[in-house]
């Protein structure tokens, strides 16, 4: 009985395999086409960025760190173009009148749409230090005079990003420690209560 039951299972599997593989092929073909269409659509959409924008800040990533920086730059009236992978964030920025490009900054076409060649600053706030390093190297080759500031989480990322051409690399933990040391050097005016 058991062997007969297993035989039925194997027969069904053999019969279903061609169907499943055909469906998988169709899905993968649609996925590849969708990715190509997405890039083409993104390029078409980004044609709205004024061609004459130059000497601007190019901010890669508008998450927790990027949004804080972006708001300060906007408040200071510094011309800004944001590159962001989140469609929702890009739509929100555009609704506010902020120039935003949907895509990955590692893609040269996306950087062209954001006018890397004449940007004054490139600010990378993305959390992946190695991806940031590759973006830095590519940007430095295309715009040797650009000021590049990047974010890192680890010492090896700082080295990697710096070697690829960043002018400055900020590591969160170091900045927290530096600020705490500064606070120790200038204690508060009031009485300090300890446990």
Residue ranges of each PLM-predicted region?
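Single conserved hydrophobic/aromatic residue that forms the stacking wall/gate
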Residues: 1-6, 10
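Hydrophobic face of alpha-helices
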Residues: 3, 21-24, 136, 177
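Hydrophobic transmembrane alpha-helical segments of multi-pass transport and channel proteins
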Residues: 11-23
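Long, charged amphipathic helices and adjacent flexible linkers at domain junctions
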Residues: 28-59, 194-195
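Structured cytosolic domains appended to multi-pass membrane proteins
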Residues: 48-193
């Amino acid at each position: 009985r058991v062997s007969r039951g297993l035989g039925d299972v194997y027969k069904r599997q053999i019969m279903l395999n061609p169907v499943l593989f055909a469906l998988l092929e169709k899905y993968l073909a649609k996925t590849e086409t969708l990715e190509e269409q997405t890039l083409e659509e993104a390029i078409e959409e980004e044609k709205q960025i004024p061609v004459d924008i130059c000497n601007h800040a190019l901010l890669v990533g508008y998450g927790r760190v990027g949004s804080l920086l972006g708001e300060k730059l906007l408040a200071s009236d510094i011309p800004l173009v944001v590159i962001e992978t989140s469609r929702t964030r890009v739509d929100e920025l555009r609704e506010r009148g902020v120039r935003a490009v949907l895509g990955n900054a590692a893609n040269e076409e996306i950087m062209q749409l954001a006018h890397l060649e004449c940007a004054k600053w490139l600010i990378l706030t993305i959390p992946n230090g190695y991806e940031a390093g590759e973006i830095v190297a590519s940007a430095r080759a295309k715009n040797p005079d650009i000021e590049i500031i990047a974010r890192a989480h680890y010492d090896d990322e700082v080295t990697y990003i710096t070697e690829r051409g960043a002018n400055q690399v900020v590591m969160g933990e170091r900045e927290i420690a530096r600020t705490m040391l500064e606070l120790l050097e200038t204690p508060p005016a009031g009485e300090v209560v300890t446990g």
